[in-house]
Amino acid sequence: MTRKQRRLMMIGGAGVVLVVAVGLVLNAMRGSIVFFSTPKMVHEQNIEAGKRFRLGGVVEPGSLTRGDQLAVAFKVSDGDATVPVAFKGILPDLFREGQGVIAEGALDTAGVFKADTVLAKHDETYMPKDVADALKKQGHWKDDYEKKPPGPGAAASADAMRPAR
């Protein structure tokens, strides 16, 4: 074998090893690529009791009930399906009915999602009070930070999204 042939064999071998490694990584990550499952996905996939996953959706208005101590129950919906959730702990400050939520836990045998962690989602206009105060103090605050963006039904032009001068 000449030097050129050996070099080509090494490059080819390294390429094969790289392809196999990428394939193994992608295969291992196949089940965990989705950040959360919606209630509709939970019903369609028939997830077995005890298997941990993340459930995401909107807290159904009127479904929040508080029990003894820190126990709460609510329903998470995606518009097509609903999953009852039970949680014992302190809820995040942004947690509200009609607000987005992601809960981590597992289904029990009765089909109730037993969450051990609840995360409240917020829209893109949310800004922590500390950050807003710091921006105001430094003189970088703009009045349009407090304005809501146009809703999904409103036509938003490029001019409407441009900061006021």
Curated annotation (Swiss-Prot):
UniProt keyword terms in alphabetical order: Cell inner membrane, Cell membrane, Cytochrome c-type biogenesis, Heme, Iron, Membrane, Metal-binding, Signal-anchor, Transmembrane, Transmembrane helix
GO BP annotations, alphabetical order: cytochrome complex assembly
Keyword set includes Calcium: no
Cytoplasmic-facing ranges: 1-7
Source organism, top-level taxon: Bacteria
Record localization: Cell inner membrane
Binding site for heme: H122, Y126
GO molecular function: heme binding; metal ion binding
Membrane disposition: Single-pass type II membrane protein
Region feature Disordered, mapped onto this chain: 138-165
Composition-biased stretches (Basic and acidic residues): 138-149
InterPro entries: CcmE, CcmE-like_sf, NA-bd_OB-fold
Residues exposed to the Periplasmic side: 29-165
GO CC annotation terms, alphabetical: plasma membrane
Compositional bias per record (Low complexity), positions renumbered to this chain: 153-165
TM region positions: 8-28
Chain's role: Heme chaperone required for the biogenesis of c-type cytochromes. Transiently binds heme delivered by CcmC and transfers the heme to apo-cytochromes in a process facilitated by CcmF and CcmH.
Classification via PANTHER family: CYTOCHROME C-TYPE BIOGENESIS PROTEIN CCME HOMOLOG, MITOCHONDRIAL
Family: Belongs to the CcmE/CycJ family.
Protein name in UniProt: Cytochrome c-type biogenesis protein CcmE
The organism of origin for this protein: Rhodopseudomonas palustris (strain HaA2)
Gene: ccmE
